[in-house]
Amino acid sequence: MDIEIKKLTPDLLKDYLHFFETEAHADNSDEDRCYCVCWCSADHRIKTDFSSPEKRRELAVQYINDGLIQGYLAYYEGEVIGWCNANTKSECLNCTSWLRFMTSVDTTETSPDTKTKSVYCLTIAPGLKRKGVAAQLLNRVCDDAAADGFDYIEAYPSKQFVDEFRSFMGPLELYKRNGFTVCQEVKDKYNDIYVVRKPLKLQAGDIK
């Protein structure tokens, strides 16, 4: 499927909002519109109101203009059909979703200079799922992260994939097909997930 992928910028704010108000939650109720505001580099240790779609929309506008939500939009025939939230892991440890659900995930690195990009969401329009859009978005994230000097890409797929709404980080098989390996399993009161990683730089012993 021939799509165009654009890195999210404030210029694309209108497209982003439209996607979340139409295709992203077409299978769900209006109350489910998240705008991906809980996965970002904002500091949610400061009390933040996520209580309604309208308040989450206001936060999305602020966060995108401030560069706190990062990721990529996929376009087909001029319309947004997919979204991947991808951000610097170390900068997102105080967002509300990490603080509430992800504290069992290992955040240590082999070196203080190691840079990891995390994939927090992969959302595809209902009529265009299973057509390779998610894989193309994921590959773009990997390519750009490598060019930006990141060492790893990391993601957190559920062990039991239910559906795109509840398992919004994508299935494990998607990541395995694209060079990721499991580096941790997390099972606690909130999660039953894999932590998967893909190296973006040659490691010692790798063949050039």
Kindly give the residue locations of the regions a language model identified.
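Conserved N-terminal entry element of GNAT/NAT acetyltransferase domains
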Residues: M1-I46, F50, A204-K208
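Conserved beta-hairpin
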Residues: Y16, I69-C84
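Short, solvent-exposed beta-strand-terminating loops
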Residues: F20-E31, C84-T96, D144-A145
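Short, basic/aromatic recognition patches
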Residues: E54-I64, I69
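Conserved acyl-donor/pantetheine-binding loop and adjacent beta-alpha core of acyl/acetyltransferases
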Residues: Q62, D66, E79-L122, K129, ...
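Conserved GNAT acetyl-CoA-binding A-motif
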Residues: T116-V119, A145-R166
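Conserved acetyl-CoA-binding loop-helix of GNAT-fold acetyltransferases
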Residues: V119-I124, R130-A146
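C-terminal "cap" of GNAT-fold acetyltransferases
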Residues: R166-N178, Q184-K208
